[in-house]
Amino acid sequence: MYAENITNAVEIQDIRAREILDSRGNPTIEADVILADGSMGRAAAPSGASTGSREALELRDGDKSRYLGKGVTKAVANVNSQIRSALLESDATDQQGIDNILIELDGTANKDHLGANAMLAVSLATAKAAAISQNLPLHQYIANLRGQTSLTMPVPMMNILNGGEHADNTVDIQEFMIEPTGFSSFSEALRAGVEIFHSLKSVLKSQGLNTAVGDEGGFAPNLRTNEEAITVIMQAIEQAGYKAGKDIHLALDCAASEFYKNGQYILAGEGNKTFDSQGFSDYLVKLTEQYPIISIEDGLDESDWEGWAYLTSKLGKKVQLVGDDLFVTNPAILQEGIDKQIANAILIKFNQIGTLSETLDAIYLAKKNGYATVISHRSGETEDSTIADLAVGTAAGQIKTGSLCRSDRVAKYNQLLRIEQQVRASYRGGEEFIGLRG
């Protein structure tokens, strides 16, 4: 009888979804999962601006008379009807079982029936409800799902200067990031990032440059070249009292698919400077030789696997090469990359694949094969901080969650500060990176 009551306590009693707004003022979906014991989990789906063509489908209404076509009432209806009916009385602690039901109910390769946004909100809300029911912090509950015994605090990739699809400026590369590698705790690393962020504002102001921010909270000035963006960040690091290449390293997200046209990489902000695959790879190699860059994300187009092979041969032993649009958090595509020795790291975004279980599959496949894992936000975010718990609970090692302003970004950093206070989790700094390991 006692065991039966325990089982009943974690049964899903109700599921309800609604439209809310993301950080860009666009609708997204939020779901609540309520268990028999009263535990409730709540989660919201993020949304990307630069997206990979093989990502799972984000279901939008397409009704131009409402939210300019970006409404998600269809996704909400799918949760409140089909998904709710399928999951009522299911065991919320059986995450794999819950996600399998969602996948089977959708029945498509790219989640275009239910929508990856609808599925993800329910998948994450279920995990949160189960964690609350078991009186566990979410990061520990996630760790338990795959038997992760050692926890680590992630090194933050802080996007302090925005370009590309994340800003209305002349800079082609989408993200210029700092990585606090030379610190012994997450809180000290975060403090360094904040100080450099404020220092960068001062540097930009002193040069008469715009200090408005982009989608992810980084500054978005008009600059003549990508290299000029790196230069002002180097100045900010020095002005803040830190040493580039020792305390702080740099990272780039090229989002190269956004400026790849007809087999050419075209830097519109630099007078339509044009490269072929090898030429743009060599351009990136040169930047790593001139500046302390230890990570490059989406350095080439998602379809340019031959170019990726060349880039990996040139930099793969000393620079982290991250596949985002390349792998879209998809274990099958990642396995293809592993087999072909393409890149050496994967960016992990829940909504690219649509369920927590599939996300964990991608993380642990990467780990098994020596690929680094970077847990990531999207440019359209909410106050939901689940990715902070995912980063710690999987010992991913790195997190990418924007700049040091905008509450949708800072929410994740604040959650990591709370977790660091609660648990014994090491901060490995530079040891997380292929080019810095001792």
From Swiss-Prot:
Superkingdom to which the source organism belongs: Bacteria
UniProt-listed Pfam families: Enolase_C (PF00113), Enolase_N (PF03952)
Catalytic site: E216, K349
Textual note on the cofactor: Binds a second Mg(2+) ion via substrate during catalysis.
Primary enzyme class: lyase
InterPro entries: Enolase, Enolase-like_C_sf, Enolase-like_N, Enolase_C, Enolase_CS, Enolase_N
Entry annotated with the keyword Isomerase: no
Subunit structure: Component of the RNA degradosome, a multiprotein complex involved in RNA processing and mRNA degradation.
Protein name, entry field: Enolase
Organism: Psychrobacter sp. (strain PRwf-1)
Gene (UniProt): eno
